[in-house]
Each structure stands twice: as C-alpha cells, then as structure tokens.
Amino acid sequence: MPPRVVRLPSLTGLRWFAALAVFACHIAQQQFFADQQVGTALLHITTLGSIAVSVFFLLSGFVLAWSARDKDSVTTFWRRRFAKIYPLHLVTFLIAGVIIFSLAEPTLPGGSVWDGLVPDLLLVQSWLPEPTIIAGFNTPSWSLSCEFAFYLTFPLWYRLVRKIPVRRLWWCAAGIAAAVICVPFVTSQFPASAETAPGMPLNELWFACWLPPVRMLEFVLGIVMALILRTGVWRGPGVVSSALLLAAAYGVTQVVPPMFTIAACSIVPAALLITALANADVQGLRTGLRSAVLVRLGEWSFAFYLVHFMVIRYGHRLMGGELGYARQWSTASAGALALAMLAVAIVAGGLLHTVVENPCMRLLGRRRPVATAPDPATDEAPKLTRA
C-alpha cells in the first residue's frame, strides 16, 4: 500500500483542464460567433463540459478516499467540507444576485431567476426537476448541490467500500461503471417530456445529469479506484494510454445519442486516467501536469469554476451594447473576446481563492491536517470516526 501522505499534484493539474473544458463548453453555447459555420463547429466541444463534470465527481471521491484517516471524526470532516465549498458558494451567489437584480431578467425562458433563490442558497437545486431553479443564480453551482450530498454520505460509503475484499475491488469498480453506462438506457424508458436541449428531454436530463443520487455513482467509483491504488492492486493502463482512451471517448460522444454523452461514454477512461495519474505521482513518474503553473491554476479552479459563467454570460451582455445577448462578432473578434473572458475569469478565480476560499478554510477548518492530495475542491483529509 503506498503511503497516504504522498501528494497527488497531477490531479490538481487535471482539475484545471477539466475546469477549462467547462469554460470552453459555455463559450460555445453562448453563440457570439457571427460565422455560423464556426458557431456550429464549436458546438461539438460542448460534450467536453459533460466529461469534465464527470471527472470532477470522480476526483472528489478519489481524493477523499486517498487522503482518508481513520482517526478523524465525521463531524470534523463535514465542518471542513462546509468550510471548503459554502463560503465561496455564498459569495458568488451574492455576486450573481446583485447582477441579476440589476438586470431584472429570467435566466431561462418560462421562469424567473428568483424561483431558484432558496434552493440555490441551500444547495438543493439539483433535487428539483425544474431548469429555471437548477440554472438558478449561478448556473455552475448545480454541481455543488451534488457535491454537498457526496460529502454528507462519504463517511458511510468509505466505510462500506473498505469492507470489500481487496480481490473484489476491481469487480466492484466494473459494476459501478456498468451502472453509469446503463443510466441512459434506463432514462430512455421514461415518459415523454419537453426537451431542454436537442435529444435531452427534461425528465431524462434531470435524472441522468442533475440528480445527486445518480451522479453519486461516479463519486463512489472514485472512492473504489483510490482504494484499488492504495491497496496495491492497480494494474491499469498508463497515463498516455488512459488519456488516449478518454480522447476516443470524446470522439464517441459526437456520434451517440445525447443522453449517452453525460457520463456513459467517458466513465471508464476517466476513472482509469485519474488512477493512472495518481499512480504516476506515487511512482515519481512524469505526467506533464505537475508544473507550478498548472498546480496553481488547479488550486484556483474551484473559484474559477464558480465565477466563469457569470463572466461569460454577463460579459456578453455588457459587450453587446443595445443588442445584448444577440450581439455577435467576427471570428477574430469573438475569439479575442473569449480569451479576454478567460483571463478575467482566471484573475477573478485567483482573487476569490485568495481572499475568500483560503481564509475561510483557515477560519472554519482549523487544525486541519496537511492536504495529501491537493484537489482544489476536496484537498484535505476526511473524517471517518464518530465524534
């Protein structure tokens, strides 16, 4: 079993690229490229956002299980998890509220943004099958609703997974991955409902993408993969092979029905890549993701993730003048605008990480142990015994 104190900086670097993929997805969806061919081509990268979110959920389970210490208490773990995500969520929630109040507009056709005020504030929006509530004040925060459920149940899942015989961990991982792959087959049997996106009926999308218990499958798979590595039974492919498999999975998302792009296509290669990167860090092998710049960006990525959509959406409206969201630009100008938005989001993320995220972690998560795997959203040792 590798020492649990081994840091996993490659996973921090990976988190940055996942956050960048979500940014690219939202840039493509904003549609401010006047050239329709370019705009249509960019829509092909939107599935990267789904892959990235799945990577986030896998990473959460993996990092918490990797850094778990039996002597720590459940209540302290919950307090530290709260300190990690909620203050930053609250600050970005308030920022979004000020902007939306000033604009006085719905976030989606057919509903008011104010419908999601309380669910978004309490991080329960993903439990409700209503797009105007899930989009809420700050659209990306829907994933925090899932993460909140993950953190509440992690001590139980970790305890259960540790009871699985080591020789059966791979079978357990295969079973969970198979369950994720089966989700779109299950949703295809749901009664018809209005489409929120082409090929994505609301009821199916809510169940497969937003509902926390379903996305928890990915989180639990991350826990299992961490224990596979910790117990020394990892025999999977290397980093390059796993990355190529994930790239191939992205290619598959271009030809399968949309519901399969949420997690079914990418779950296996994403889980393999995360574990391969962690194994490379343990073995001291090069991964290309451990540079100081990538690690720093990875540390900022949680704040970047929460602020980037506001920069894109309301930046579009601000730059659009009288045309607002309908304004489009030439390919060169739109590309420059996208890069400027990326720069603003990075700076804003770094600032929020420095003045909100870190201070709140120090204030509310005192006496926390040194992070064993620097994951910007889940980077300290969990608590596993009853306080």
From Swiss-Prot:
Span of the signal peptide: none
InterPro entries registered for this protein in UniProt: Acyl_transf_3_dom (IPR002656), Acyltransferase_3 (IPR050879)
Membrane topology note: Multi-pass membrane protein
EC number annotated for this UniProt entry: 2.3.1.-
One GO cellular component, as annotated: plasma membrane
UniProt key word Secreted: no
Keyword Ion transport on entry: no
Molecular function per GO: acyltransferase activity, transferring groups other than amino-acyl groups
Keywords, in A-Z order: Acyltransferase, Antibiotic biosynthesis, Cell membrane, Membrane, Transferase, Transmembrane, Transmembrane helix
GO biological process assignments: antibiotic biosynthetic process; lipopolysaccharide biosynthetic process
Top EC group: transferase
Subcellular location: Cell membrane
Transmembrane intervals: 8-28, 45-65, 85-105, 139-161, 170-190, 209-229, 236-256, 258-278, 292-312, 336-356
Superkingdom of origin organism: Bacteria
Family: Belongs to the acyltransferase 3 family.
Protein name in UniProt: Acyltransferase MdmB
Annotated gene: mdmB
